[in-house]
Design a protein with these regions (language model features):
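Predominantly soluble domains enriched in secretory-pathway, periplasmic, or organellar proteins
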Residues: 1-398
Length: 398
């Protein structure tokens, strides 16, 4: 459960690395330009989705983990997840998977073990505010609930968050919640009851209560928020908060997420911290319950120095502790920070050109000392981008 799956974006592969030994376990073929990796609830299966709509499943419990099935779900896709619920309503662990497509705009429910397509549901819909029909209402992010047999599916152009009940896929129930338009990435709060998602071109975070199945709030944040799945912190003053970075400005902003014990801070921006330099460019922000830090990347900033830097904040004071520049021998941008299972290491990809693998690497930093402790290199390390720890991803720890 400390394996790390690393997307090798432009060579159409995913590398599986042992997070303890740092040794390469296998490299598997995938769809084109894999967007994300997700794991089944048991941790046995690794799911990938390419931007070409090809989904693959890797069995991590094989002696040498490898691809066991693939399916073409559409022509353009971004999201995939599995069923994670086990409780009074049934045992759905590893039973289903779901893919969200850009084109055609639909979601596809799959058998979680074989990827056999079971149900296709169109997401063409109406905009929640102007009531205009949108044929290309694309599926952005998808997350799986731990408390109910349902997926949270974000319909980008319509501004709707769909709660898709998979307890009976022959007659699925869908709660369509009006939120805000141009929904993109998002993640759970610490309780996994509330889902927070960026409506990035509206500079808004939409928050849904998945228990009550209703919109809680639309909270204005900075310019073009891009949280990935965000970062959850138990703050000494504000209680549980969830944080995002931004593509359009240099701030980290955090929203209170505890309406019971900290109602005065709930659904408000309670922290606004600034990073050095002009502009944003942040794609990912990450922390871990065992870590005192927040790590932030800025690969899409216009300044080459900031593209190649990582920013580390104290998660209680939100003071900048370090701006870490990657070694000069590597040519590329620092992208996607990810903790190991124990929360004492931070992995980051150095994303460069496809034909220059010798100038790219996966760097591993000690979260306590903030020093570089390991460099993973080789001819196979070509265009590394996202990397996903098995345990943290299947448990939604971020």
């Amino acid at each position: 459960q400390n394996f790390m799956a690393v997307i090798l974006r432009d060579v159409v592969k995913v590398a599986i690395i042992d997070g303890d030994t740092k040794e390469l376990v296998n490299i598997v073929d995938t769809g084109f330009a894999v967007h994300i990796v997700r794991y089944s609830a048991s941790g046995r299966y690794l799911y990938t989705i390419g931007r070409d709509g090809k989904a693959t499943i890797v069995d991590l419990w094989m002696k040498k983990p490898d691809t066991v099935a693939e399916v073409k779900t559409c022509y353009d896709a971004r999201s995939i997840d599995s069923s994670k619920y086990k409780g009074p309503k049934g045992d759905f662990l590893d039973k289903y998977a779901i893919v969200g497509c850009y084109w055609p705009p639909h979601m596809v429910i799959l058998d979680g073990n074989t990827l056999e397509p079971l149900k296709i549901i169109s997401t063409s819909s109406y905009t929640y505010d102007t009531n205009e029909f949108v044929r290309e209402a694309r599926v952005a992010s998808i997350v799986a609930s731990h408390h109910d047999p349902e997926w949270v599916v974000n319909i980008k152009e319509a501004g709707q968050i769909w709660l898709v009940d998979y307890s009976n896929i022959r007659a699925p129930k869908i709660a369509m919640i009006e939120a805000e338009r141009f929904l993109h990435d998002g993640g759970w709060d610490a309780s996994k009851r509330y889902f927070l998602v960026a409506a990035n071109f509206r500079d808004t975070i939409s928050i849904v209560d998945t228990k009550e199945k209703k919109l809680v709030a639309n909270v204005k944040v900075g310019r073009i928020p891009h949280p990935g799945r965000g970062a959850n912190i138990d703050h000494p003053k504000y209680g549980p908060i969830w944080c995002t970075g931004h593509l359009g400005d240099n701030t980290i902003q955090c929203i209170g997420t505890d309406p019971v014990k900290h109602p005065q801070y709930a659904w408000k921006v309670v922290v606004k911290a600034e990073m050095p330099g002009e502009g944003g460019g942040t794609l990912f922000i990450k922390t871990h319950p065992k870590s005192p830090h927040i790590w932030v990347d800025r690969p899409l900033n216009n300044d080459p120095k900031l593209q190649r830097s990582l920013f580390v904040f104290d998660k209680n004071t939100f003071k900048l502790k370090a701006q870490i520049e990657i070694p000069e021998k590597y040519a590329g941008r620092a992208v996607h920070v990810e903790y190991n299972r124990n929360g004492d290491e931070v992995w980051v990809s150095i994303w460069g050109k496809k034909n220059e693998p010798q100038k790219q690497a996966i760097l591993i930093y000690d979260d306590k000392t903030l020093k570089l402790k390991h460099e993973i290199t080789g001819d196979w390390v070509a265009t590394p981008t996202g990397h996903f720890n098995v345990y943290n991803t299947m448990k939604d720890i971020y």
